[in-house]
């Protein structure tokens, strides 16, 4: 389920490192987290939508890889992002 432009803009302004930042790991993880939460809500209603479930698993894996990258590059930014989004730290492959 794609995000609309207003939601993307709001997420970018909230998590951007500087003006016009669209590609930092923080922004990417925040957008993926929003899509994951939207798909999770969809799957609560539509339990047999296996195509969307596969898409959800792909998004979760992509977010996990981005979090692993951020934890390896800058652990303080990783911890701040995880706390801000309310993600379990185990989501990044055990980086604590």
UniProtKB/Swiss-Prot annotation:
Gene Ontology terms for molecular function: rRNA binding; structural constituent of ribosome
GO biological process: one example: translation
SMART domains assigned: Ribosomal_S15 (SM01387)
Domain of life: Bacteria
CDD domains: Ribosomal_S15p_S13e
Keywords: Ribonucleoprotein, Ribosomal protein, RNA-binding, rRNA-binding
Entry GO terms, CC: cytosolic small ribosomal subunit
Function: One of the primary rRNA binding proteins, it binds directly to 16S rRNA where it helps nucleate assembly of the platform of the 30S subunit by binding and bridging several RNA helices of the 16S rRNA.
NCBIfam families: S15_bact (TIGR00952)
Complexes and interactors: Part of the 30S ribosomal subunit. Forms a bridge to the 50S subunit in the 70S ribosome, contacting the 23S rRNA.
Family: Belongs to the universal ribosomal protein uS15 family.
Protein name: Small ribosomal subunit protein uS15
Highest classification ranks of the organism: Bacteria, Bacillati, Actinomycetota, Actinomycetes, Kitasatosporales
């Amino acid at each position: 389920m794609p995000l609309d432009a207003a939601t993307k803009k709001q997420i970018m302004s909230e998590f951007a490192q500087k003006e016009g930042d669209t590609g930092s790991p923080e922004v990417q993880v925040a957008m993926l987290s929003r899509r994951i939460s939207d798909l999770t809500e969809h799957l609560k209603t539509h339990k047999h939508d296996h195509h969307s479930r596969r898409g959800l698993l792909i998004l979760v894996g992509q977010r996990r890889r981005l979090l692993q990258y951020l934890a390896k590059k800058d652990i303080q930014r990783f911890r701040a992002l995880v706390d801000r989004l309310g993600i379990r730290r185990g989501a990044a492959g055990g980086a604590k």
